[in-house]
């Protein structure tokens, strides 16, 4: 008969392999959508025009939200026609779509590299503006001002650097969550953070974009230097998050 107590002791004595565990975390991470499938569907529905259409959908997602039918109620005639065409062409959905359906937010997340660059231009049209974020942390990094930014974070950065970037990004997510969800406005920072931490970590640990490419994006955005060290603005935002209420 097995000695279960002894087996328990023997198991506890086994080494903890950091690389192996981190690989499992990436494999088992929660994934709300498949970025590869999103791009596949965009190309399938859009043909030669998919890239230009995707940019339109990203701008809509950033400035108007994820419900195309509702946003059309307050929009110019030309805008309504454009959105209607996108809905029909790409079969855009709202709510909780299946793996094989597109939403505006999925397009923005799947193409996060362009999304984050567009934020620099669109920062004053967002639910939480760049000016508002500057009031919380001077020169707040515009590239961080959308949940899709998490997909650009390199999880292989040194621990302190990675934590600073995620804290800096969380400063925006904290404000964003309270603006778009009135039920969270009276909640503590910890309670609000609990609503965005899982999807943020899922995006960070996804394997759609390599660590090397993510590091290149972060450097191009001016968020880290060649050694992966966060910029002064990122560090300031990280500190602001730690002291935020």
From Swiss-Prot:
Domain of life according to the entry: Viruses
Disulfide bond annotation, renumbered to this chain: none
Primary localization class, coarse: virion
UniProt-listed InterPro entries: Capsid_Phlebovir/Tenuivir, Nucleocapsid_Phlebovirus
Subcellular location, record wording: Virion; Host cytoplasm; Host nucleus; Host endoplasmic reticulum-Golgi intermediate compartment
UniProt region (Essential for oligomerization), positions on chain: 1-71
Ribonucleoprotein is among the record's keywords: yes
Outcome of swapping residue 74 to D: Complete loss of RNA-binding
Protein name stated in the entry: Nucleoprotein
Organism the protein comes from: Rift valley fever virus (strain ZH-548 M12) (RVFV)
């Amino acid at each position: 008969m097995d000695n279960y107590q002894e087996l328990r002791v023997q198991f506890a004595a086994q080494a903890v392999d950091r690389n192996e565990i981190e690989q499992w975390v990436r494999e088992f991470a929660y994934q709300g959508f498949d970025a590869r499938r999103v791009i596949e569907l965009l190309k399938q529905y859009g043909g030669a025009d998919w890239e230009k259409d995707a940019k339109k959908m990203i701008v809509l997602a950033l400035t108007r939200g994820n419900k195309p039918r509702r946003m059309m109620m307050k929009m110019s005639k030309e805008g309504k026609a454009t959105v209607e065409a996108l809905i029909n062409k790409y079969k855009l959905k709202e709510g909780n779509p299946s793996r094989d359906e597109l939403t505006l937010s999925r397009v923005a997340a799947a193409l996060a590299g362009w999304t984050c660059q567009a934020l620099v231009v669109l920062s004053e049209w967002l639910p939480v503006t760049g000016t508002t974020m500057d009031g919380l942390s001077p020169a707040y990094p515009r590239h961080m001002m959308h949940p899709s930014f998490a997909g650009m974070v390199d999880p292989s950065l040194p621990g302190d650097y990675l934590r600073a970037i995620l804290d800096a990004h969380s400063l925006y997510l904290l404000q964003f969550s309270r603006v778009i969800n009135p039920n969270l406005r009276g909640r503590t920072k910890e309670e609000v953070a609990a609503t965005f931490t899982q999807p943020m970590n899922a995006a960070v640990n996804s394997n759609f974009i390599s660590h090397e490419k993510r590091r290149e994006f972060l450097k191009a955005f001016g968020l880290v230097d060649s050694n992966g060290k966060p910029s002064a603005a990122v560090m300031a935002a990280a500190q602001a998050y730690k002291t935020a209420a």
